[in-house]
Amino acid sequence: MNVPNLLSLSRLILSPLILYFVLEENYLSSLVLVLFLALMDFLDGFFARKLNQSTRMGKILDPLADKVFTFFSLLSYTFFSKERLNPLIFFLLLGRDITLIIGGIFLIKRKFTPEPSIYGKFTTLFVSLSLLSVGILNVYDVNFLRILTNVLEIVSLILILVSWVDYTLKGFKMIFKE
């Protein structure tokens, strides 16, 4: 197993610990783990490109690790932490991702390759910043950060909806383009 795949597998295995630390009210450890796993996510992609070690297994492991990491982070910081993320973010992302999975399977069966969306990338960025902000708020109660978190959550919600519509429209265009 190469380095990028080992990093992805490690993220997959370690992600549930975020929930464990939050349930134990060990918010500093959960925040450190979230930051560590985010760094590992960056490094697995970096090594895959720089060492030319992109593999079929990695193309499955990396997005799976991303989804598991996101799920446990969102679950932990939406429902179980002292400071909580807006639950609409969790439910809208869940709905969007279920739609993407079903649509992706349908497109792949019809020999289409689903393309990433710039809106999806911005959604990931702002949801990640929202999670990080809530994670920090659980450790340090900073009033400015509370305001920033609210703004990040609003932007995240808008981007989730925009990316959902964008992915759906692109999927329909591919299907009806035949």
Curated annotation (Swiss-Prot):
Its EC number is 2.7.8.5. Keywords: Cell membrane, Lipid biosynthesis, Lipid metabolism, Membrane, Phospholipid biosynthesis, Phospholipid metabolism, Transferase, Transmembrane, Transmembrane helix. Gene3D superfamilies: 1.20.120.1760. It is a multi-pass membrane protein. One of its GO terms (biological process) is phosphatidylglycerol biosynthetic process. Disulfide bonds: none annotated. The chain crosses the membrane at residues 28-48, 88-108, 125-145, 147-167. Signal peptide: none annotated. GO terms for molecular function: CDP-diacylglycerol-glycerol-3-phosphate 3-phosphatidyltransferase activity. The keyword Transferase applies. Pathway: Phospholipid metabolism; phosphatidylglycerol biosynthesis; phosphatidylglycerol from CDP-diacylglycerol: step 1/2. Its main location: membrane. GO terms for cellular component: plasma membrane. It catalyses: a CDP-1,2-diacyl-sn-glycerol + sn-glycerol 3-phosphate = a 1,2-diacyl-sn-glycero-3-phospho-(1'-sn-glycero-3'-phosphate) + CMP + H(+). PROSITE patterns: CDP_ALCOHOL_P_TRANSF. The keyword Lipid metabolism applies. It is an enzyme of class 2 (transferase). It is found in: Cell membrane. Belongs to the CDP-alcohol phosphatidyltransferase class-I family. This protein catalyzes the committed step to the synthesis of the acidic phospholipids. This is CDP-diacylglycerol--glycerol-3-phosphate 3-phosphatidyltransferase. The gene is pgsA.
